């Protein structure tokens, strides 16, 4: 258990061997509910090489003085990461949906909203 966000690691060992290693992290929010974004790599057990980096966004709840993982979402490829970036930039662009403008007029049927 971790009492602080600094104590949380995304590294993971299997039978004493590091199979997931944290490369970097960004704390997105702090408090009773904290959100941390991790950049990490996983070991390919067949080739003994590290696979392409992935991203995990993890929500933690502080309960009885310790942070406990509540949920997570993995971004598994650069293509998926770039699609997420493009959508957020579009939504928050001047005049975009999140910026109070009409934004993109896609309907639910063609992938919007």
List the model feature ranges, each with a label.
Residues 1-82, 86-113:
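Positively charged, low-complexity terminal tracts
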């Amino acid at each position: 258990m971790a009492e602080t966000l600094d104590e949380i690691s995304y590294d993971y060992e299997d039978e004493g061997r590091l199979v997931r290693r944290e490369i970097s992290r960004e704390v997105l929010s702090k408090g009773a509910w904290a959100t941390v974004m991790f950049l990490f790599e996983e070991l390919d057990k067949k080739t003994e090489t590290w696979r392409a980096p992935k991203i995990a966004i993890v929500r933690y709840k502080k309960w009885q003085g310790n942070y406990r993982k509540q949920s997570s979402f993995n971004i598994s490829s650069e293509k998926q990461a770039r699609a997420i970036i493009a959508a957020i930039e579009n939504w928050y662009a001047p005049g975009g949906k999140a910026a109070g403008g009409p934004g993109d007029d896609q309907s639910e049927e063609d992938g919007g909203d």
